[in-house]
Amino acid sequence: MSKKYDAGVKEYRDTYWTPDYVPLDTDLLACFKCTGQEGVPKEEVAAAVAAESSTGTWSTVWSELLTDLDFYKGRCYRIEDVPGDKESFYAFIAYPLDLFEEGSITNVLTSLVGNVFGFKALRHLRLEDIRFPLAFIKTCYGPPNGIVVERDRMNKYGRPLLGCTIKPKLGLSGKNYGRVVYECLRGGLDFTKDDENINSQPFQRWQNRFEFVAEAIRLAEQETGEKKGHYLNVTANTPEEMYERAEFAKELGMPIVMHDFITGGFTANTGLSKWCRKNGMLLHIHRAMHAVIDRHPKHGIHFRVLAKCLRLSGGDQLHTGTVVGKLEGDRQTTLGYIDQLRESFVPEDRSRGNFFDQDWGSMPGVFAVASGGIHVWHMPALVTIFGDDSVLQFGGGTHGHPWGSAAGAAANRVALEACVKARNAGRHLEKESRDILMEAAKHSPELAIALETWKEIKFEFDTVDKLDVQS
């Protein structure tokens, strides 16, 4: 009998380190950044990750004889050094597709980032990327509508969509909240938004907010002749309550609802996405709590993984950071996971942080949402970075206008249309940004005041989580 059936404790690398293995098209592939305890060989650390995230346990057990672990086990098939980091290395692991329930992002993450992150042989562990096989993608529900359908629903084409978060995000009564929504929408925005932590608090119960927002949208649509929307946050303490709120939004004729997908959970998110498709509603996704998981460069889950998982779980819009605003995120990394949200096929490109080719098949794309510390001076860079299939959201950059929210919205709309017109004429937005905006401001006093107000506001901090690439 083979030694693999001998009783006792074995080194993980004897079973789970398989450098000769050639991954199958149907394998789910994962790249982990590993930092092992001192004195533990890389192969043992990597094999331990493969074991603990698939079929392994610390001891040989008799029940292994009842199945074929060689078929079901995860296999570490490659190890690479991390550029500029002598302590860490990349471990590439292949998992057979049968380890995962069809269409369940919850199950995939439970396996890949479950107990293994508490393993004593590791000082740090980070899930950098996942290659989802097309066979798995076809079992996932994906975005309830996607980019093309959303544009048709809102009747908006040829430019990024424009939005803002209502401020102050907490403390307003339902009526005053609706008033701010109206001011922003009549000023020229396409969307306004609940912030992530506005649910149903004593100062503003959710039914009250929904009703006043619906009235504000109807008035703004009548005044402007444009389709408008507001992201009504239906995140709740139970799934039943979440669906009750979504149903009420539908009854009011609202086009879109919102969910905090990390705090709410992937199971709730997938269920809500299915409901939205069935009921003809758009779904905006906020990423609240993501930085707890993704910001440490050596431990956690990279946001590109969360973005991929969200596309599979379902959402029509997802916050991605801004590059130029107040939130973490360098340009190349951000472009890398924006590609994962919108494209049908994304090739391996380490300069953008993509470790694998990713084929999305026919799955609809997701709008990238730029939000957090942005204002009119950022508009040329935002249009360049994010392109048309994006939502640019200015919270303080709308409400902070000296003339009020309507004027702030008008300034942003004029700046956006000026940038799109200049781009379409072949001008270089970032090199000519000042000239483009100042020319537009000659015909818009709202924009002129906004440019003067925000001219000194910058968020120039180094990125904590940088790409691991050789210079």
Curated annotation (Swiss-Prot):
Active-site residues, Swiss-Prot/TrEMBL: 167, 286
EC id: 4.1.1.39
UniProt remark on cofactor binding: Binds 1 Mg(2+) ion per subunit.
Residues bound to substrate: 115, 165, 169, 287, 319, 371
Positions of Mg(2+) binding: 193, 195-196
Subcellular location(s) of the protein: Carboxysome
Reactions catalysed according to its record: 2 (2R)-3-phosphoglycerate + 2 H(+) = D-ribulose 1,5-bisphosphate + CO2 + H2O; D-ribulose 1,5-bisphosphate + O2 = 2-phosphoglycolate + (2R)-3-phosphoglycerate + 2 H(+)
This protein's UniProt keywords: Bacterial microcompartment, Calvin cycle, Carbon dioxide fixation, Carboxysome, Lyase, Magnesium, Metal-binding, Monooxygenase, Oxidoreductase, Photorespiration, Photosynthesis
Residue numbers bearing the N6-carboxylysine modification: 193
Cofactors named for this entry: Mg(2+)
Positions marked as site (Transition state stabilizer): 326
Subunit structure: Heterohexadecamer of 8 large chains and 8 small chains.
Note from the entry: The basic functional RuBisCO is composed of a large chain homodimer in a 'head-to-tail' conformation. In form I RuBisCO this homodimer is arranged in a barrel-like tetramer with the small subunits forming a tetrameric 'cap' on each end of the 'barrel'.
Protein name, as recorded: Ribulose bisphosphate carboxylase large chain
Source organism of this protein record: Synechococcus sp. (strain RCC307)
Upper taxonomic lineage: Bacteria, Bacillati, Cyanobacteriota, Cyanophyceae, Synechococcales
